[in-house]
Swiss-Prot record:
Belongs to the DP1 family. InterPro entries: TB2_DP1_HVA22. It is a multi-pass membrane protein. The chain crosses the membrane at residues 18-38, 47-67, 68-88. This is HVA22-like protein b. The gene is HVA22B. It is found in: Membrane. Induction: By abscisic acid (ABA) and salt stresses.
């Protein structure tokens, strides 16, 4: 009988992250979120909204880098510790992490298009176009770049939808 209990304890310790992870990261926050919705206080609403936003970021990170994270042996335990810090009411980890890192990143202005170079105010379209006007051997601008387009040539090939096409 004692070997059965010992085996059970061994299995629980080996799979602690699998057992405790969903309870700590989903079940308790869900319960606390429902209680926060039903309460009149807005402080707990902010705590749990912040938690769910951070939990979503963690899950997106995991989904993106799953192949890399599966090679890190202690990642499940580190995630469990981080999630516990975010969830536990006395620590307010979610509020701290959001206020000090995520909020400052989201509210700071970001450069979206780093390759955009604005035109100068004194640029003249004619002067700019003159820089790229083709010139002939004497240095004078050419009259016409393309004189005419020959439209007399017809496509002689067949398509797969023609009746005369041989397969």
């Amino acid at each position: 009988m004692s070997s059965g209990i010992g085996s059970l304890v061994k299995v629980i310790f080996k799979n602690f992250d699998v057992i405790a992870g969903p309870v700590i990261s989903l079940v308790y926050p869900l319960y606390a979120s429902v209680r926060a919705i039903e309460s009149r206080s807005h402080g707990d609403d902010k705590q749990w909204l912040t938690y769910w936003a951070l939990y979503s970021l963690i899950k997106l990170f995991e989904l993106t880098f799953f192949r890399l994270l599966e090679w890190i042996p202690l990642y499940p335990y580190a995630k469990l510790a981080l999630t516990s810090w975010l969830v536990l009411p006395g620590m307010n980890g979610a509020a701290y992490l959001y206020e000090h890192y995520v909020r400052s990143f989201l509210l700071s202005p970001h450069t979206v298009n780093v390759w955009y170079v604005p035109a100068k105010k004194d640029d003249d379209l004619g002067a700019t176009a003159g820089k790229f006007t083709p010139v002939n051997d004497s240095g004078a601008p050419q009259e016409k770049i393309v004189s005419s387009v020959d439209t007399s040539a017809k496509y002689v090939g067949h398509s797969a939808f023609d009746d005369a096409y041989i397969y």
